[in-house]
Amino acid sequence: MPALADKFAVNLKSERLRRKLSQEALAAKAGLSVSYISMLERGQRTPPLDTLESLAKALAVSPTSLLA
């Protein structure tokens, strides 16, 4: 897994858990499927920019914070 995708996966899950959200709740807030959230958190997918922005908005963080 590339370093950026690895960081994104870890940060996404960390931010979700910090907010005490289930994958289902995050998926609903971001307008995505639960299976897609799961794949992102496992580093099996890299989101396009619009999805990154949706996830950041749902988690109330900046998109760059999910990549750092």
Regions found by a protein language model. Give the residues of each.
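Conserved hydrophobic/aromatic packing and binding residues within compact polymer-binding modules
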Residues: 12, 26-27, 37-40, 66
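Short amphipathic helical patch at the helix-1/turn junction of helix-turn-helix
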Residues: 6, 17-18, 46
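DNA major-groove recognition helix of helix-turn-helix/homeodomain DNA-binding modules
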Residues: 50-65
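Short basic helix-loop element that most often maps to the first helix and adjoining turn
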Residues: 10-29, 54
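Residue-level marker of alpha-helix boundaries and capping positions
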Residues: 3, 14, 42-43
